[in-house]
Amino acid sequence: MAASPKINRREHILQCLATMLETSPGQRITTAKLAAEVGVSEAALYRHFPSKARMFEGLIEFIEESLLSRINLIMDEEKDTMKRCQQLLQLLLVFAERNPGISRVLNGDALLGENERLRSRISQLFSKIETHLKQILREKSLREGQAFSIDEAVLANLLMAIAEGRIAQFVRSEFKLKPTKHFNEQWTFVQQQLLQS
């Protein structure tokens, strides 16, 4: 029973951090500002997280769990190559759109001046997602008997660049230009080009 309020307080701190990242674009979040937002002292923050880096790691863990678990569902449930790619990219874009503050973490914007391991961890997450795309594209020849005329790693990188670019535009526009805007039309075009290759 004693652990339950602690978990809730940790979650509340992370929610406040994500909200501050959304409402204060371009500004660095200090522990003093975060403590004021949460309504506790800085010392109380440090009882739940030993450092600000650990708070960001908590957000990154949430991102990883949310995205990777859903990607695994897509991999299990959908067998069509193009639909898998579309759903994976759409998942990433919708997640960023629904979590504007967290999109700053995905973009790396919120991690400037923070511990290097945080940026490295986000980079690793994007590498994992790109690896899933490569796997999807490579399985096309096995599942459908057709291969692409260009290396699957190059195509996976292109698809990731599209998603990362949309997230960067979202952050740069201070969350006005939604990452999912025009995605369906853009995907239709990209898919046609991929199927012709």
From Swiss-Prot:
It is found in: Cytoplasm, Nucleoid. PROSITE patterns: HTH_TETR_2. Pfam families: SlmA-like_C, TetR_N. GO terms for cellular component: bacterial nucleoid; cytoplasm. One of its GO terms (biological process) is negative regulation of division septum assembly. Residues 7-67 form the HTH tetR-type domain. InterPro entries: Homeodomain-like_sf, HTH-type_Tx_Regulator, HTH_TetR, NO_SlmA, SlmA-like_C, Tet_transcr_reg_TetR-rel_C_sf. GO terms for molecular function: sequence-specific DNA binding. Residues 30-49 bind DNA. Residues 109-136 form a coiled coil. Required for nucleoid occlusion (NO) phenomenon, which prevents Z-ring formation and cell division over the nucleoid. Acts as a DNA-associated cell division inhibitor that binds simultaneously chromosomal DNA and FtsZ, and disrupts the assembly of FtsZ polymers. SlmA-DNA-binding sequences (SBS) are dispersed on non-Ter regions of the chromosome, preventing FtsZ polymerization at these regions. Homodimer. Interacts with FtsZ. NCBIfam families: PRK09480.1. This is Nucleoid occlusion factor SlmA. The gene is slmA.
